[in-house]
Swiss-Prot record:
Protein name in UniProt: General odorant-binding protein 2
Its biological purpose: Present in the aqueous fluid surrounding olfactory sensory dendrites and are thought to aid in the capture and transport of hydrophobic odorants into and through this fluid.
Molecular functions per Gene Ontology: odorant binding
Family matches, as InterPro entries: Odorant/phero-bd_Lep, PBP/GOBP, PBP_GOBP_sf
Taxonomic source organism: Epiphyas postvittana (Light brown apple moth)
Length: 161
């Protein structure tokens, strides 16, 4: 009976952690997305793709447009999240995610997922093409890990940023 309760406590604690990380991810997404308009022209992102980008976490949003990779690269550079070679700057990404309420619960997992998604595409020379593939991989892996936010969560925190 004691082991049953121990399992229940672990499951409940784990479910709160997943919910907490998804909530933190909603803050990260909302804040990061604020740089999109600044990067729209620079990246050649069409108005249609710009409007779709707000639905990044929806299952039916396809992360495939090269211009989206350019926009993500531009946005990442606004927050110093990339190194000169257009790969994630691990320390800066940790600090960025930790800057949000309860960000420390998400930071390591997010950096790990992005880093693992960078590896298979490392040989792609076109930075925008590589970044969009990494973003697509990250979206899938974040959903699998249970840290992807619901669109409603993002909308709820948008006004803070």
């Amino acid at each position: 009976m004691a082991s049953y309760w121990a399992v229940c406590v672990v499951l409940v604690a784990g479910s709160h952690l997943v919910a907490g990380t998804a909530e933190v991810m909603s803050h990260v997404t909302a804040h990061f997305g604020k740089a999109l308009e600044q990067c729209r022209e620079e990246s050649g992102l069409s108005t249609a793709v710009l409007e779709e980008f707000q639905h990044f976490w929806r299952d039916d949003f396809e992360v495939v447009h090269r211009e989206l990779g350019c926009a993500i690269l531009c946005m990442s550079n606004k927050f110093s999240l990339m190194q000169d070679d257009a790969r994630m700057h691990h320390e800066n990404m940790h600090d960025y995610v930790k800057s949000f309420p309860q960000g420390e619960v998400l930071s390591a997992k997010m950096v790990e997922l992005i880093h693992n998604c960078e590896k298979p595409y490392d040989d792609i020379k076109d930075d925008c093409e590589r970044v969009v593939k990494v973003a697509a991989c990250f979206k899938v892996d974040a959903k699998k890990a249970g840290i992807a936010p619901e669109v409603a969560m993002i909308e709820a925190v948008m006004e803070k940023y």
